[in-house]
């Protein structure tokens, strides 16, 4: 992939950009083999890739510069701003949004936050696009509610320019730290969730719910999990760290009992909305800590699917799963190193199959799906 920002030495986020996609995939596959060394694997499935560019559905932009000439992108450690509006990872549909937002910031009087001076209001712009219908969610991350009245007053102009903006919010992040968002979310539109659809499964994206940033590869990941579960005798399933329910909603059947657990209430609201649309009455989603939920249960499902953050599921949950001994475990991970550590804490399970998904091209990161069977 050609990138003017990389060539100019202004951005180094895509550290593997000089390698071909095939070279990247080979290196990631070798890394996964190294991490699982000593753990017998029955079947290595062919890795799955996706588009080389324009694949991201989300932009996280630091806002710097002045209210008359705002700059969207990132800050180097020395405070130097870099404009990332031309990043080739973003779809072409983002460009007109960025263009309209620059004069809008002046209209609304949203002074960009100055990190060195600890002054200003607008810290970040968070933009998400639905692959399903092109609808977008825009979040203004502000230091305080001081400019809310001005922001609301200026919004009709922005919505006339960009009718694709379905969900608009103000997120309040008052702390002088590099934290992307705060706890308070103020909706500025009637619509509060963005509709998405993978493999004919309706999904919803809310402001504070995690959603994969590479929809093409994510849809293939969910479809693969559905295929694997469909080949197993599963009538009762847990989906831990379930997010908006992508895995569980793909894998569930009308006959299956499924419980999805996620600590973020916004994500659970999305999952419940999708389950209702699908008419799946035996799906239950709850906003709880996944480890605390699992260790408090007295019943054993046929299959436990886990999709933890980068830290993995950890030894306490591994120990409990080993003791509870469900027949199958599916582990989806964005950090194969912690996944490999966790699997080594499950000695009574063998790896039936593994598949790598290149969710993050031009970086060393990747997603991996692993099916474990009780011995």
Curated annotation (Swiss-Prot):
Reactions catalysed, as given in the entry: uridine(747) in 23S rRNA + S-adenosyl-L-methionine = 5-methyluridine(747) in 23S rRNA + S-adenosyl-L-homocysteine + H(+)
Catalytic residues (UniProt): 334
Pfam families listed in its UniProt record: tRNA_U5-meth_tr (PF05958)
Keywords annotated in UniProt: 4Fe-4S, Iron, Iron-sulfur, Metal-binding, Methyltransferase, rRNA processing, S-adenosyl-L-methionine, Transferase
Binding of S-adenosyl-L-methionine, residues: 212, 241, 262, 307
InterPro entries: 23SrRNA_MeTrfase_RlmC (IPR011825), MeTrfase_TrmA_AS (IPR030390), MeTrfase_TrmA_CS (IPR030391), SAM-dependent_MTases_sf (IPR029063), U5_MeTrfase_fam (IPR010280)
EC number per UniProt: 2.1.1.189
Residues that, per the record, bind [4Fe-4S] cluster: 3, 11, 14, 87
Gene Ontology molecular function, alphabetical: 4 iron, 4 sulfur cluster binding; iron ion binding; rRNA (uridine-C5-)-methyltransferase activity
BP-aspect Gene Ontology terms: rRNA base methylation
Domain of life, source organism: Bacteria
Key word Thylakoid present: no
CDD domains for the chain: AdoMet_MTases (cd02440)
Recorded family membership: Belongs to the class I-like SAM-binding methyltransferase superfamily. RNA M5U methyltransferase family. RlmC subfamily.
Function text: Catalyzes the formation of 5-methyl-uridine at position 747 (m5U747) in 23S rRNA.
PANTHER family (alphabetical): RNA M5U METHYLTRANSFERASE, TRNA (URACIL(54)-C(5))-METHYLTRANSFERASE
Name of protein: 23S rRNA (uracil(747)-C(5))-methyltransferase RlmC
């Amino acid at each position: 992939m050609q990138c003017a920002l990389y060539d100019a030495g202004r951005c180094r986020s895509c550290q593997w950009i000089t390698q071909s996609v095939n070279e990247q995939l080979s290196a990631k596959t070798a890394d996964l083999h190294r991490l699982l060394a000593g753990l017998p694997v029955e079947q290595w499935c062919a890795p799955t890739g996706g588009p080389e560019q324009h694949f991201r559905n989300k932009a996280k932009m630091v806002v710097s510069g002045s209210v008359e000439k705002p700059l969207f992108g990132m800050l180097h450690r020395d405070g130097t701003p870099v404009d990332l509006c031309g990043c080739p990872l973003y779809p072409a549909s983002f460009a007109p949004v960025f263009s309209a937002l620059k004069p809008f910031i002046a209209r609304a009087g949203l002074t960009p936050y100055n990190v060195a001076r600890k002054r200003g209001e607008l810290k970040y712009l968070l933009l998400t696009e639905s692959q399903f219908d092109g609808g977008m969610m825009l979040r203004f991350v502000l230091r305080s509610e001081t400019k809310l009245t001005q922001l609301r007053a200026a919004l009709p102009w922005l919505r006339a320019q960009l009718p694709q903006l379905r969900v608009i919010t103000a997120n309040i992040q008052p702390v002088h730290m590099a934290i992307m968002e705060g706890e308070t979310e103020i909706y500025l539109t009637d619509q509060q969730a963005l509709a998405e659809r993978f493999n004919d499964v309706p999904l919803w994206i809310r402001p504070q719910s995690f959603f994969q940033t590479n929809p093409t590869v994510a849809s293939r990941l969910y479809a693969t999990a559905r295929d694997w579960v469909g080949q197993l005798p599963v009538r009762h399933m847990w989906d831990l760290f379930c997010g908006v329910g992508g895995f569980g909603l793909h894998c569930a059947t009308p006959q299956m009992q499924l419980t999805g657990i996620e600590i973020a209430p916004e994500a659970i609201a999305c999952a419940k909305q999708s389950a209702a649309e699908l008419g799946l009455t035996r799906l239950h989603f709850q906003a709880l800590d996944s480890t605390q939920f699992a260790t408090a249960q007295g019943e054993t499902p046929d299959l436990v699917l886990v999709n933890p953050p980068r830290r993995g599921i950890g030894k306490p949950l591994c120990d409990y799963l080993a003791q509870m001994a469900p027949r199958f475990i599916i582990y989806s991970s964005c950090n194969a190193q912690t996944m490999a550590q966790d699997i080594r804490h499950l000695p009574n399970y063998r790896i039936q199959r593994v598949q790598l998904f290149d969710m993050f091209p031009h970086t060393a990161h990747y997603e991996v799906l692993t099916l474990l069977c009780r011995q």
